[in-house]
Amino acid sequence: MVTSVACGGGNTIKKAVPGPTATVRSARAAHLTLSSTAFSDGAPIPKQYTCDGANQSPPLSWSAAPTGSASLSLVVEDPDVPGGGFVHWTVSGIAPSVIALQAGHAPPGATEGRNGAGSVGYTGPCPPAGQTHHYLFMLKAVAGSTVLAVGELTGTYQRPGP
């Protein structure tokens, strides 16, 4: 199923559709510490990482994945978009030995998925003018379909109002 949602600038875009596989979170999932040198948890995301700037993914780093992790996956989503949110970036197949992403890059060997705009790769925050939206960066360490650890980082962005 594909639904259409409005996202900034009056453009209509398609919302990403989740894949057919699901993951199960372990009852004892560990915590990954996910952070960025560009912004703190709960703070505004700098303009260069948005549609109003260079539209590149921010630098991210995290604590080591737990033993037994087969890979890491990252999803960036705006839950404030009406109709169920908007996916800005998905990256899967990140090697468990990787502990950081440089700005504007996915790690070698990882797979970037389609975002809510229908393109592959990152698309930066772009809420309607005058509205503040929240952007949830969620990193999961997985083994098969089991989630071993989760880390979250939230940023905000507001475009100037009319």
Q: Across the structure, where does each feature detected by a protein language model lie?
A:
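N-terminus-centered regions that define maturation/targeting leaders and the start
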Residues: 3-162
